[in-house]
Design a protein with these regions (language model features):
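Charge-rich, low-complexity N-terminal segments
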Residues: 1-103
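Active-site-proximal segments of catalytic enzyme domains
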Residues: 102-107, 121
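Short, conserved beta-strand/beta-arch hydrophobic-aromatic motifs that form part
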Residues: 110-162
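Well-ordered alpha/beta subsegment
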Residues: 164-203
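Hydrophobic, Leu/Ile/Phe/Ala-enriched alpha-helical segments that form helix-helix packing faces
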Residues: 85-93, 152, 195-202
């Protein structure tokens, strides 16, 4: 298969990601989806890969509070990266429309449209909702395929959601640490893509 590298719409981001990929050998030779541009062109399907090429996250894991409301307490970085991630995901095909970012509430559920969502409940937090972003204490919830969830946890990008361990959310539900820079934004885009395709019935 032809190797694709992640392409960002913002100037300068691609150059930073290119340097990062050559500094992290796990990324070289792996398929990194052209997430932001390709999905904006309604070509999310061809942008999709697995997460087996995830690098190991640098630095310590953020502190979290584990409980029914499982939240990330620190290490958020500049929230412009989280905002950019959310705004991009909301442009993907078959995502239900949402209000502009400035008018959103403290919780942003990201759902597939009814026509696109699979009937598998293990792919969703609630009905057709594969991702949820908390803004009060910035936190990302994603439902991932189990192998992908395992890799994201082991390589430092996520931790199991408390309610998943209690059987109240799908086993692949994780708390993904919010991106602090363009490199982490790229990895979060890969994880969102895996979650998005897990719930789609029309891939």
């Amino acid at each position: 298969m032809k190797t694709n590298r992640l392409v960002f719409q913002k100037s300068g981001a691609l150059a930073q990601w290119s340097r990062f990929s050559f500094e992290n050998q796990e990324l070289i030779g792996t398929e990194i989806p052209q997430t932001l541009e390709m999905m904006h062109k309604n070509d999310a399907r061809s942008a999709r890969i697995g997460s087996d090429g995830l690098p190991t996250r640098r630095g310590r894991r953020p502190k979290t509070i584990r409980g029914p409301l499982h939240i990330q307490c620190n290490g958020h970085g500049d929230l412009k990266y989280l905002n950019q991630l959310v705004d991009e995901v909301l442009t993907w095909p078959y995502i239900e429309s949402a209000q502009p970012f400035i008018s959103r509430s403290n919780t942003i559920p990201i759902r597939l449209t009814e026509m696109a969502a699979s009937s598998d409940p293990s792919a969703f937090i609630t009905d057709r909702e594969f991702a949820r972003i908390l803004l009060g204490a910035p936190t990302i919830y994603l439902v991932l395929p189990l192998p992908c969830a395992h890799r994201a946890i082991v390589r430092g990008w996520a931790e199991p959601h408390y309610l998943g361990s209690q059987g109240l959310m799908p086993a692949g539900t994780v708390v993904v640490y919010t991106p602090k820079d363009v490199e982490e934004l790229a990895v979060c885009s890969v994880l969102f893509s895996d979650s998005y395709h897990l719930g789609r019935k029309i891939d």
